[in-house]
């Protein structure tokens, strides 16, 4: 069942209550500070606040978790966003020369939005999202997770629900935070393989696939039939199939034959059309060249699996160290959903809503008894692991610095 999208989100007093009683400031502080004790990583961190009036205030920074909580409560923004760690506190920006304030580091971030899958989802459209089309996001998370772990060696990353129709990935490994803008673009280029969102032409990816792409294909193939051909069934619409499925094939004779067959036999399901491709190709291509046609057809179908299911990233979010991104546990102003940490098993209806949390608090006045607590626990466990790894990294750096200089050539 499709979730309806509310246009009347939380009120100013709702947000005031949320920041005062429910928002996990301490865990967010420890995450961004990489230590329970205030350090440069938090004191020099930029925060931006967005208000229901349309105002947007950048270059806020906080000295402690108490200051963080007090300032957010006082300002009561609709949401706040997290930016880079600078060489000086961003709040001092007006007293500095423009060249004096420099961004040093920030988490490597990725953003996946359902909009980029609209050509292939039929269960919902626009701002709507349900558990069926959310599978596109879950698969994108799976592929990205594998690349981050196996290809880049990152350990400390977490996904956060955007509150409506997307997900954000925060990579907090020390190596990732220190990436330059050029290096961030290099990582992006590696992961963002399917750059062309144009569905009316063939991908024609080079063979052999890069190992990452070959691995991704094997991860995605088991889901293609159930998600694309059965649940979404986008190509049952004959014109849509002619516009987005046929251009992915390589042979004009095959394309013309399929087009005629589908117009003569309308409303065949996506699964039937997928099988039609093989059957008509077999009848057309016989003799000594049949094997080469079979190989080309298989490659076209592999490209289609990747075109439909491979992660579609919002590239601007990843490119720059200074880019700001909405903080975890913010409230989406339109839906009232909490932007909670998630994993591949998440579905959007699992996200707690502020209105429900307020009802739970009225009964118990205890955050630990609300639907928010399991997500806070999940985030706390992530932060604890990050701090442990951060401490280990600092110790290794100190040990390296303490090693005596060698006279060996």
Curated annotation (Swiss-Prot):
Keyword match RNA-binding: no
Active site: 46, 111, 113
GO BP term, pick one: DNA replication, synthesis of primer
Recorded coiled-coil stretches: none
Top-level taxon: Eukaryota
UniProt GO MF annotations: ATP binding; DNA-directed RNA polymerase activity; metal ion binding
InterPro entries for the chain: DNA_primase_S (IPR002755), DNA_primase_ssu_euk/arc (IPR014052)
Mutagenesis / variant outcome for changing residue 184 to Q: Temperature-sensitive
Enzyme Commission no: 2.7.7.-
Metal-binding in keyword set: yes
One cellular-component annotation, GO: alpha DNA polymerase:primase complex
Family: Belongs to the eukaryotic-type primase small subunit family.
General remark: The bound zinc ion is not a cofactor. It is bound to a zinc knuckle motif that may be involved in sequence recognition and the binding of ssDNA. Present with 197 molecules/cell in log phase SD medium.
Function, in words: DNA primase is the polymerase that synthesizes small RNA primers for the Okazaki fragments made during discontinuous DNA replication. In a complex with DNA polymerase alpha (DNA polymerase alpha:primase) constitutes a replicative polymerase. Both primase components participate in formation of the active center, but the ATP-binding site is exclusively located on p48.
Subunit-structure text: DNA polymerase alpha:primase is a four subunit enzyme complex, which is assembled throughout the cell cycle, and consists of the two DNA polymerase subunits A POL1 and B POL12, and the DNA primase large PRI2 and small PRI1 subunits.
Protein name (record): DNA primase small subunit
Lineage: Eukaryota, Fungi, Dikarya, Ascomycota, Saccharomycotina
Gene: PRI1
């Amino acid at each position: 069942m499709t979730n309806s999208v509310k246009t009347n989100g939380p009120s100013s007093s709702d947000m005031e209550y949320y920041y005062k009683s429910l928002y996990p400031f301490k865990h967010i502080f420890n995450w961004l500070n990489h230590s329970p004790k205030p350090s440069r990583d938090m004191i020099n961190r930029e925060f931006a606040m967005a208000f229901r009036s349309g105002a947007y205030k950048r270059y806020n920074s906080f000295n402690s978790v108490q200051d963080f909580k007090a300032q957010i409560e006082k300002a009561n923004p609709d949401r706040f966003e997290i930016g880079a760690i600078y060489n000086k506190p961003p709040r001092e920006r007006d007293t500095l020369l423009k060249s004096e304030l420099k961004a040093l580091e920030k988490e490597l971030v990725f953003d996946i939005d359902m909009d980029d899958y609209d050509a292939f989802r039929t269960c919902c459209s626009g701002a709507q999202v349900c558990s069926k089309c959310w599978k596109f996001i879950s698969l994108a998370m799976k592929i990205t997770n594998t690349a981050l772990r196996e290809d880049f060696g990152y350990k400390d990353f977490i996904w956060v629900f955007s509150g409506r129709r997307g997900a954000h990935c925060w990579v907090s490994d020390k190596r990732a935070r220190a990436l330059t803008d050029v290096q961030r673009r290099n990582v992006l280029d590696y992961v963002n393989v399917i750059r062309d969102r144009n569905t009316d032409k063939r991908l024609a990816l080079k063979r052999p696939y890069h190992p990452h792409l070959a691995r991704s294909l094997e991860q995605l193939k088991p889901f293609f039939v159930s998600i694309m051909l059965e649940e979404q069934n986008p190509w049952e619409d004959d014109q849509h199939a002619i516009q987005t499925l046929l251009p992915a094939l390589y042979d004009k004779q095959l394309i013309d034959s399929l087009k005629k067959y589908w117009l003569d036999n309308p409303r065949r399901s996506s699964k039937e059309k997928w099988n039609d491709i093989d059957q008509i190709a077999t009848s057309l291509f016989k003799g000594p060249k049949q094997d080469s046609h079979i190989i080309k057809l298989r490659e076209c179908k592999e490209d289609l699996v990747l075109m439909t299911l491979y992660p579609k990233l919002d590239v601007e979010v990843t490119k720059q160290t200074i880019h700001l991104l909405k903080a975890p546990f913010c409230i989406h102003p339109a839906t009232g959903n909490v932007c909670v940490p998630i994993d591949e098993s998440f579905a959007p209806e699992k996200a707690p809503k502020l209105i429900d949390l307020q009802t739970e608090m009225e009964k118990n006045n205890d955050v630990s008894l609300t639907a928010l607590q399991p997500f806070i626990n999940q985030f706390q466990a992530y932060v604890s692991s990050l701090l442990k790894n951060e401490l280990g990294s600092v110790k290794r750096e100190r040990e390296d610095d303490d090693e005596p200089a060698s006279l060996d050539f």
